[in-house]
Amino acid sequence: MPAKKRTRKTVKKTVSFSDDTTLTTHQNREKKNVDHDRPPVYVRKTPLMTFPYHLVALLYYYVFVSSNFNTVKLLSFLIPTQVAYLVLQFNKCTVYGNKIIKINYSLTIICLGVTFLLSFPTMLLTILFGAPLMDLLWETWLLSLHFAFLAYPAVYSVFNCDFKVGLWKKYFIFIVVGGWISCVVIPLDWDRDWQNWPIPIVVGGYLGALVGYTIGAYI
């Protein structure tokens, strides 16, 4: 009988370099340190808590109560109510790492000044999008102030969360998109007072902010 051939098992050879192992371990430690130093930031999915009830009241006042759509007076109501919304609602839903950040009252005041300054680049962008420059410059700046202070809670959160801009930019986008969509009613030949610049854009910005702060946590 022919002798059976023995099959030899192939042994996989592995080579380990201590320098590579040390480098991998060091990179893993660095990643853990980065995660510890820059914990994740998110807004809790609590629409009843993040819903900006005050914007509904302000819109109702502006459209149905105020005389001649007083944009200046509306702004004087917007600023304090946005601060109250940040302190009482929005900040309590913002989680940094594993904890809710306590409100920084000095930072709220600083961010009021920052938001005011943001109205100037906002005005420039509004003009680039086609806003009137010479004839209605005051109205255009008022619109920019409204847009800037509608984003005030997001501006504060950028400063209070180590400048994590990516999370908060969606709130700016909602405001801009709301104002941009509302432009369609201006050229219509209806001859209504509410078609005058910048009334429709103000209303659109408020509606955009209303939607953004309500569903922003889900996006």
Curated annotation (Swiss-Prot):
Cellular localisation: Endoplasmic reticulum membrane
MF annotations from Gene Ontology: mannose-ethanolamine phosphotransferase activity
Transmembrane segments: 46-66, 68-88, 109-129, 136-156, 171-191, 199-217
Topology relative to the membrane: Multi-pass membrane protein
Pathway of action: Glycolipid biosynthesis; glycosylphosphatidylinositol-anchor biosynthesis
KW Chloroplast (keyword) present: no
Family named by the database record: Belongs to the PIGF family.
Signal peptide (residue range): none
InterPro entries, A to Z: GPI_biosynthesis_protein_Pig-F
The name this protein goes by in its record: Glycosylphosphatidylinositol anchor biosynthesis protein 11
Record function comment: Acts in the GPI biosynthetic pathway between GlcNAc-PI synthesis and GPI transfer to protein. Required for the formation of complete GPI precursors CP1 and CP2.
Pfam families registered for this protein in UniProt: PIG-F (PF06699)
Species, as recorded: Saccharomyces cerevisiae (strain ATCC 204508 / S288c)
GO CC, alphabetical: endoplasmic reticulum; endoplasmic reticulum membrane
GO biological process: GPI anchor biosynthetic process
Stretches assigned to the Cytoplasmic side: 1-45, 89-108, 157-170, 218-219
Phosphoserine, modified sites: 16
Topological domains annotated Lumenal: 67, 130-135, 192-198
UniProt keyword list: Endoplasmic reticulum, GPI-anchor biosynthesis, Membrane, Phosphoprotein, Transmembrane, Transmembrane helix
Main location: endoplasmic reticulum
